[in-house]
Design a protein with these regions (language model features):
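Feature marking well-ordered beta-strand scaffolds used for ligand recognition
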Residues: 1-189
């Protein structure tokens, strides 16, 4: 069992006495009614948002990483659950400190460019990028994810890509946008 550790978005209302734990906690559920922490991948910053962990080896997560604005894509090796490690990372071009933003990755005013979550299948990972649409990554070398393709539908549509679910048997990816504004007032999705 894994659990994300993320500082709440409303952290201005969180007392300073509450510790900022950021990362991935790993638990043994040998005794399901008595989960026991056995490992911890500690990260700096606000921590880990969404996670996908189905193969028993790698967790695919949206995480705050040093030197990268907002969330990036982190692949955590959990094959030794008592000693989890970073296996690979990818970030939206232009979001790493000192990196120039390529023209095709430039956000419009008010847009949020960061990783929301990732769902891998085989040697591909399908990554939701909030207002930057989605990207398909080649993860055949887990330590160096590489962009295969990118599509951004915001604008003209409302954006805030939440989930990108591959349907390999149908050669499709279903992308779902999240409503984050009052009364769903952010344009057609």
């Amino acid at each position: 069992l894994i659990q994300n550790q993320e500082r709440p978005y409303f952290d201005k209302s969180v007392p300073a006495s509450v510790p900022n734990e950021a990362g991935i906690k790993v638990y043994s559920i040998e005794k399901p009614t008595e989960p026991r922490e056995i490992g911890y991948l500690k990260l700096r910053g606000k921590g880990v948002h969404r996670m996908w962990f189905t193969d028993g080896k790698y967790a695919h997560v949206g995480a705050m990483l040093p030197g990268i604005e907002e969330r990036a894509y982190l692949i955590a090796d959990l094959s030794n659950p008592t000693n989890p490690k970073e296996a690979g990372r990818w970030w939206i071009p232009g979001t790493k400190e000192g990196e120039e933003t390529p023209p095709d990755w430039t956000p419009f005013a008010g847009e949020h460019f960061h990783v929301h979550g990732a769902i891998p299948h085989g040697d591909r990972s399908y990554v939701a990028l909030v207002d930057a649409g989605m990207v398909i990554l080649d993860i055949s070398d887990i330590s160096k994810p590489k962009t295969i393709s990118h599509i951004d539908w915001s604008p003209p549509f409302g954006g805030y890509a939440h989930t990108t679910l591959p349907l390999p048997g149908r050669k499709l990816v279903v992308a779902v946008d999240e409503s984050v504004k009052y009364d769903c007032n952010e344009g057609e999705k």
